[in-house]
Amino acid sequence: MRKKFFCTFPQGLISEPIISHTLGERFAVIPNIRAASISDTMALVAVEIDGEPKAIEDSVAYLRERGVKVEEMTDNE
C-alpha cells in the first residue's frame, strides 16, 4: 500500500533525518520524498510512504508524536 502525506516540521526537527532514516528502520516502510521546502524555521515536505497499512499508520503516529503536523493527501494533490 502507498499513501501520500504533507508534513510540516517545526524548527527543532528540521535537522533530524526522521523521514529518510527513522521511518524506514523503525517501521519497515519505504518513504519517498516527492517535494520539500526548508527554511530556518520550518520544513514542508510532501512524502509517499509505502508499506503495510499498520506500518504506515504507526509511522504517521510517530511523526505526530514528535510534533510533525501530518495531513493525508488526496489523489488530486
Summary of predicted features, one role per range:
Residues 1-77:
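Long, contiguous binding/interaction regions
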